[in-house]
Amino acid sequence: THEPGAAATLRFAGLPTHDKRVELWLPHNEATLLVALRSDAALEPVGDDGRRVWLHHGSSISQGSNAASPSTIWPALAAARAGVSLLNLGFGGSALFDPFVARAIRDTRADLISLKLGINLVNADLMRQRAFAPAVHGFLDTIRDGHPDTPLLVVSPIHCEIHERTPGPGAFDLEALASGKVLFRATGEPGERAAGKLTLEFIREA
């Protein structure tokens, strides 16, 4: 459910008087509306600071669903360590080869592109084995239209025990919820692989 919070004011006092770059990391698991930005000195948008741009697209694992803060999501940590500017297109439950996402990546400046795909296709039970490879190639072809020479890394899904050999959809484990734990279970059956349902093992081997 959506529960709007009260308006709040954040104040940053005691900053040095010289020109400085200020980055505000907004919550990664909430929608934030900026009502006003006030300052006692001139504000200017940051231009090109010379850093390379890393564009990453993935699932909630990339969005940081379980991270403690937006700057401690794994892509943010990796970008900080590499000294690059991160554009994180991690969409919880929605890394699904949507054409508009491919077009957005195609039309966005990037020096490196990485795609971490697979888990949402299985836990959403979105498509069958026959559609998987063409969907991947269509997604990549669209991106390549705008980035013919940009390094592009496709990362297979990390281990997820419930979906390694068992198709989705995934669902909450109600017994675990009753005990205060958030766990998931696969509602598909291993035998459904023969009917074309996806598993993580199939995606890695395709």
What are these regions (language model features)?
Residues T1, F12, V22-L24, A78, ...:
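Generic structural hydrophobic/aromatic packing signal, biased to beta-strands
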Residues T1-V53, D145, R165, F172-F184:
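N-terminal secretory targeting modules
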Residues H2, H28-L33, N88-F91, R128-F132, ...:
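Short linear motifs at secondary-structure transitions and domain/linker junctions
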Residues G5-A7, A36-S39, L96, A135-V136, ...:
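Short amphipathic alpha-helical surface micro-motifs
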Residues L15, V22-G92, P99-R109:
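Serine-esterase "nucleophile elbow" of acetyl-processing enzymes
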Residues G93-S94, N120:
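Positions that flank functional sites
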Residues P99-A206:
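Alpha-helical cap/lid subdomain in secreted, periplasmic
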